[in-house]
From Swiss-Prot:
Core subunit of the mitochondrial membrane respiratory chain NADH dehydrogenase (Complex I) that is believed to belong to the minimal assembly required for catalysis. Complex I functions in the transfer of electrons from NADH to the respiratory chain. The immediate electron acceptor for the enzyme is believed to be ubiquinone. InterPro entries: NADH_UbQ/plastoQ_OxRdtase_su3 (IPR000440), NDAH_ubi_oxred_su3_sf (IPR038430). Pfam families: Oxidored_q4 (PF00507). It catalyses: a ubiquinone + NADH + 5 H(+)(in) = a ubiquinol + NAD(+) + 4 H(+)(out). The keyword Cell inner membrane does not apply. This is NADH-ubiquinone oxidoreductase chain 3. It is an enzyme of class 7 (translocase). Belongs to the complex I subunit 3 family.
Length: 116
């Protein structure tokens, strides 16, 4: 048997043995203490299902999108060392223009206003 196949079989065997032990070893019998919610040592005061602000959700999505675009700019110092630094400058300018246009669009749509 090859080394890779032996490793796969050994890993699968160890995983199955550990899963079998984890399934049969603890005899969990649910009681009131185990089924009660735990919140910093206190009983919960209210429902955990609070209304979620859609404005906060939109701000979080905008942050993720703009953060991703900024992450595209991180390898620029290495891109300037390529054979064609002009293409790096062109792509950098394109990304920055798209980022700026997206920010202006969200600004005019009122997506950056936290309170109305």
């Amino acid at each position: 048997m090859s080394l890779i196949m032996s490793s796969v079989v050994a890993t699968a065997l160890v995983s199955l043995i550990l899963a079998f032990i984890a399934f049969w070893l603890p005899s969990l019998k649910p009681d009131n203490e185990k089924l009660s919610p735990y919140e910093c040592g206190f009983d919960p005061l209210g429902s955990a299902r609070l209304p979620f602000s859609m404005r906060f959700f939109l701000i979080a999505i905008l942050f993720l999108l703009f953060d991703l675009e900024i992450a595209l700019l991180l390898p620029l110092p290495w891109g300037n060392q390529l054979f064609s630094p002009f293409s790096t400058l062109l792509w950098t300018t394109t990304i920055l223009v798209l980022l700026t246009l997206g920010l202006i669009y969200e600004w005019f749509q009122g997506g950056l206003e936290w309170a109305e």
